Amino acid sequence: MPAIAILTGASSGIGAAAAQQFMDRGDTVINISRRDCPVAGVETIGTDLGDAKSLASTCAALSERLGSQPDGPVCLVHNASLMLKDRCDVTSDEDLERVLAVNVVG
């Protein structure tokens, strides 16, 4: 039975490769990201994973898209992440909070 795969950060790299694998299996793939996924057939819900209001809007869009009883199993792959280029001792609190918001909270 085809699954519904929800991936964060499928706009490039490992996330896009994972999206391609799910698509190759015949699954429905939804990308949660600020940018579109380059894989044909992947639906994108534009989201800033570090922003609470954006996440709330995304949850509403997913609920509307999937309904109360999705057809098939649902898989969530939280792949999105941010990486700082500066050393920890020169990283601002705001930058660290942004990384935690995307990598952990989002």
Segments the model singles out, each with a brief description of its role:
Residues R87-C88, S92-E97:
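Substrate-binding pocket helix/loop in short-chain dehydrogenase/reductase
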Residues R25-V39:
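Conserved glycine-rich Rossmann-like NAD(P)H-binding loop of the short-chain dehydrogenase/reductase
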Residues I4-L7, P73-V77:
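Conserved hydrophobic beta-strands of the Rossmann-like cofactor-binding core
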Residues N79-L84:
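Conserved NAD(P)H cofactor-binding loop of Rossmann-fold oxidoreductase domains
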Residues G50-G67:
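Conserved Rossmann-fold cofactor-binding substructure of NAD(P)-dependent oxidoreductases
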Residues S11, A19:
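N-terminal Rossmann NAD(P)H-binding glycine-rich loop of SDR-like oxidoreductase domains
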Residues A40-K53:
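Rossmann-fold cofactor-recognition segment
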